[in-house]
Amino acid sequence: LHGIKRTLGTRQKAKKPILINDLKLIIKAIDKEKIRDKALILIGFSGGFRRSELVNIYYDDIEFVQEGVKILVKRSKTDQSGEGSIKAIPYFDNQEFCPVIALKNYINKRFSNINEGKIFDISDKSVALIIKRYAERAGLDSSKYAGHSLRSGFATTAAEFGAE
């Protein structure tokens, strides 16, 4: 029945984008030892990643460079042929909110003895649950956020700063 309603054009309820101030609250709500979650959220936002892209990043897809990190997205919703694209994320001045530092810290801990595998070995649905959990801990209405909130927050923030 749900699929029929969508075919007939019922409007989907859009979730709220995570904007900078909310992102800061969410990051501050993450326990210090939850370095995976911090890296996931900061990389997801700063790279404008889809949930499916985040959970399909492998160790070999990441290259740390002097300016930050390059992440190979092998396949995405709009790249069905699998040509791939590279997302470059720079270092941020504020280390607490720097996605590159958060990712480095997480990789150094998780991959200390192995150099292969998925970076975030979770499902795309888990991404949404993680976002909701920390939105709630930050005092935000978690029902208004979902996995896409990182990507839409990135796009909204970029537009506010003049990106086209």
Regions found by a protein language model. Give the residues of each.
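Extended, non-catalytic subsegments within catalytic or DNA/protein-binding/adaptor domains
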Residues: 1-164
